[in-house]
Amino acid sequence: MLGSCGILFTIIAYGALFYFGMFQRGGIYDKLRSQLAVTMLNSAVKEIEFYKLQHAHYPVSLREAEPKDKMQMNSFIDPTFIQHKGTSDGRFYYEVDPSGSFYYLRSVGPDGIPFTGDDILPTLTEDERKNTGLRLQR
């Protein structure tokens, strides 16, 4: 009886942690996901720029620049991603300008629409950003 109660408590506790960490919106977990998104966006900029050095052009999509080694961390997955109608895979929003000379990169935020007030952007300094093709606004 006591063992069964312990197992039940463990299942409930881990289930609650999983729910609050993965699905609940609002509160401290959203803030943590937003902070992680900024860190990952900053890493993604570096990976995109490295891709350009190797291939002489920006990747057409983030999938094209993903690490080939599956053991390597993928910086293009948005930790704040919420499934929206019409969205596909949980990656950051990425768009290369038709000229191929610059790109837009961001987390689209809770509304799922790019270039709105809830978007999360990379936090590069002006000096860091001027050496990249990253544009923050259209």
Predicted regions and their residues:
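Amphipathic alpha-helical segments typified by the pilin-like N-terminal helix
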Residues: 1-39
